[in-house]
């Protein structure tokens, strides 16, 4: 069994913000796996599907970003899953906009959702689908930037990025993070 977590904030005021790309990818992964968010457990919305012969739970924590780890930690404990069974999808200020990268472990880079997940699951050694949102303009607070919506001109590249991020999460489930990283990150490098 695998757990894929899309990080984001609940509520319509946060829909389609940079900080909610994890939720957007979770929605697309659920659609691809013919799963629906019908279960409410662990202070989250859950959808159950199958990929690569594996049972997959897709989670959207409803705790707000800074407390996402509470939901993730509870689910891992309940299902007796290890960090190798976890894939987290999140926005990343350090990656250029619309770039997708798969990695295992590493620092939280100031991302409060990742800080919370790390604290509640016992460390950072899980697969992450990083979705680049770029840096804020000079003198703009990064918190305001990530809570801002994408511009209309960004809709086409955003949709393409979400397709690639969804595929990265699916490959991490089906192939394991190490093999999936070779494919995902090679494609990302070739794309520029």
UniProtKB/Swiss-Prot annotation:
For the keyword Translocase, the answer is no
Q: What is its EC number?
A: 3.1.1.29
Q: Which Pfam families match?
A: Pept_tRNA_hydro
Indicate yes or no for the key word Heme: no
**One Gene Ontology CC term in the entry:** cytoplasm
According to its UniProt record, which reaction does this protein catalyse?
an N-acyl-L-alpha-aminoacyl-tRNA + H2O = an N-acyl-L-amino acid + a tRNA + H(+)
| Annotated keywords | Cytoplasm, Hydrolase, RNA-binding, tRNA-binding
A single GO BP: protein quality control for misfolded or incompletely synthesized proteins
Positions of the record's site feature: Stabilizes the basic form of H active site to accept a proton: 91
- Top EC class, one word: hydrolase
What GO MF annotations does this protein's record show?
peptidyl-tRNA hydrolase activity; tRNA binding
**Catalytic-site annotation from UniProt:** 19
* Annotated InterPro entries: Pept_tRNA_hydro, Pept_tRNA_hydro_CS, Pept_tRNA_hydro_sf
Q: What does this protein do?
A: Hydrolyzes ribosome-free peptidyl-tRNAs (with 1 or more amino acids incorporated), which drop off the ribosome during protein synthesis, or as a result of ribosome stalling.
The cross-references to PANTHER family, in alphabetical order and at most eight, read: PEPTIDYL-TRNA HYDROLASE
The annotated subunit structure for this chain is: Monomer.
Which family does the similarity line name? Belongs to the PTH family.
Identification of the protein by name: Peptidyl-tRNA hydrolase
Q: Lineage, please?
A: Bacteria, Pseudomonadati, Myxococcota, Myxococcia, Myxococcales
Q: Which gene encodes it?
A: pth
């Amino acid at each position: 069994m695998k757990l894929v977590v899309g990080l984001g904030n609940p509520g319509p005021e946060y829909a389609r913000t940079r900080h909610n790309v994890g939720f957007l990818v979770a929605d697309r992964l659920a659609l691809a796996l013919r799963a629906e968010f019908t279960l409410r457990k662990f202070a989250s919305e859950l959808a159950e599907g199958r990929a690569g012969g594996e049972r997959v739970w897709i989670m959207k924590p409803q705790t707000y970003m800074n407390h996402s780890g509470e939901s993730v930690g509870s689910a891992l404990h309940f299902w007796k899953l290890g960090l190798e069974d976890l894939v987290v999808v999140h926005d990343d200020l350090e990656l250029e906009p619309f770039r997708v990268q798969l990695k295992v472990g590493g620092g939280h880079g100031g991302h409060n959702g990742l800080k919370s997940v790390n604290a509640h699951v016992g460390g950072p050694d899980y697969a992450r689908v990083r979705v680049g949102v770029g840096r804020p303009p000079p003198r703009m607070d990064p918190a305001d930037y990530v809570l801002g919506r994408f511009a209309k001109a960004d809709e086409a590249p955003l949709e393409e990025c979400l397709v690639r991020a969804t595929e990265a999460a699916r490959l991490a489930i089906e192939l394991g993070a190490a093999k999936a990283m070779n494919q995902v990150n090679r494609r990302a490098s070739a794309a520029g």
